[in-house]
Structures are given as C-alpha cells and as structure tokens.
C-alpha cells in the first residue's frame, strides 16, 4: 500500500487498531503516548512526531519501506 498523506496514514492506523479490537486508550497505553496523540494521529494531523507515529505503527504490526525517488534531472 502506498501512502501519500498523513490522513491516509491515520486512516490505516485506525483501521488496523479496530481490526485488533483495541481502543485508543489501549493503544496509547501500549505505546506510552497520550490518548490525544492517538486521536490526532488517526485524524491525520501532520504535526504528529514521526518517531512516535512509527512506534504506534510498529506496535500494530505495520511495516514500512522507504525508497528513494529519482531526481527530476535523472529521469531524462
């Protein structure tokens, strides 16, 4: 799955959390973050800290791969 926005990332977090029958409070406690952080993350708030966001994803079993895109002048 290719994610292109913080809203898509948040929707994925929410979907997987619900599939695992976890409340926002459960997930927050498991990740040592506030419930407010989980709420903001699931809403796609762009200012959520990356390290915390990736920790939440990892706790849910979501894995990511990063790929470098070619620069514009390299595509020619």
Predicted regions and their residues:
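Recognition helix of helix-turn-helix/homeodomain-like DNA-binding domains
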Residues: 32-46
């Amino acid at each position: 799955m290719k994610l292109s926005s913080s809203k898509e990332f948040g929707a994925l977090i929410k979907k997987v959390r619900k599939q695992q029958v976890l409340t926002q409070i459960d997930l927050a406690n498991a990740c040592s973050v506030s419930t407010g952080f989980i709420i903001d993350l699931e809403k796609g708030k762009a200012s959520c800290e990356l390290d915390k966001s990736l920790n939440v994803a990892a706790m849910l079993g979501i894995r990511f791969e990063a790929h470098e895109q070619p620069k514009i002048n390299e595509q020619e």
